[in-house]
Amino acid sequence: MATVEPETTPTPNPPPTEEEKTESNQEVANPEHYIKHPLQNRWALWFFKNDKSKTWQANLRLISKFDTVEDFWALYNHIQLSSNLMPGCDYSLFKDGIEPMWEDEKNKRGGRWLITLNKQQRRSDLDRFWLETVLCLIGESFDDYSDDVCGAVVNVRAKGDKIAIWTTECENREAVTHIGRVYKERLGLPPKIVIGYQSHADTATKSGSTTKNRFVV
C-alpha cells in the first residue's frame, strides 16, 4: 500500500548577519563615492616668499602637485587664502613640468593677461578672482586654446595685488585674445573694464613703471 509523505514546511532563512549586510551594501555602493575624477593635466602649486637674504629661486618653493578634482580641493582647503598672505608673497599654479619663471622654455616666448587690483579689493575680490582663475586652468576652460595656457600667478603686494594667466606664445593672436575674452567673462568683469596682455620680454625690458599692452579685451 502506498504511503503518503507528510507535508513539510520550508525552513525560513535566518536573518542576515551584520557582516552579510555590510557585504551586500558594499556590492551596490555607488562608485562615484570612491573614484577620483582625473583632470586633463597634472598641476603644480608653488609658493614664493620674498626673503631679500636669499636668491629669487631659493625663495620659490613647490608646495604640491595634483591631477584629480578631489586632490585639488583637498589642497586648496588646506592652504592660506591669498588675502591672508604677507605682502611680497606669491602663489603660482602651473602645468607640471613648467616652472613659474620667464626663463622656462614654455614661458620665454609668452606673456600674461594681467588683472590689477587696488588695496580695497583684497578683501572683496582677490580670493574670488584667484579661485576662478585656478578653476579656469584646471577645468581647461579655454576650448581649443587651453594648451596655450602655462599657468597663473597671484602677487600679493602692499601697493595693490595682481593676478595673471600666462600663455606660451605671445605672437599667437587668435589663442591669446580668445583666452583673454573667456577669462574676462569668467571673472564677471563689466565691458568698461579693460584688461591687457603683455609679453614677458616687454615686461623684462620695460623703461618706467608700466609695460605696453600687446592686446586688450
UniProtKB/Swiss-Prot annotation:
It is found in: Cytoplasm, P-body; Cytoplasm; Cytoplasm, Stress granule; Nucleus. Coiled coil: none annotated. Phosphorylation increases the ability of the protein to bind to mRNA caps and to form the eIF4F complex. Phosphorylation also enhances its mRNA transport function. Phosphorylation at Ser-209 is not essential for protein synthesis. The keyword rRNA processing does not apply. Residues 1-27 are annotated as: Disordered. GO terms for cellular component: cytoplasm; cytoplasmic stress granule; cytosol; eukaryotic translation initiation factor 4F complex; nuclear body; nuclear speck; nucleus; P-body. MRNA binds at residues 56-57, 102-103, 157-162, 205-207. One of its GO terms (molecular function) is translation initiation factor activity. The modification Phosphothreonine is found at residue 22. GO terms for biological process: mRNA export from nucleus; regulation of translation; translational initiation. The modification Phosphoserine is found at residue 209. It comes from the Eukaryota. Residues 37-40, 73-77, 132-139 are annotated as: EIF4EBP1/2/3 binding. PANTHER family: EUKARYOTIC TRANSLATION INITIATION FACTOR 4E, EUKARYOTIC TRANSLATION INITIATION FACTOR 4E RELATED. Belongs to the eukaryotic initiation factor 4E family. Acts in the cytoplasm to initiate and regulate protein synthesis and is required in the nucleus for export of a subset of mRNAs from the nucleus to the cytoplasm which promotes processes such as RNA capping, processing and splicing. Component of the protein complex eIF4F, which is involved in the recognition of the mRNA cap, ATP-dependent unwinding of 5'-terminal secondary structure and recruitment of mRNA to the ribosome. This is Eukaryotic translation initiation factor 4E. The gene is EIF4E.
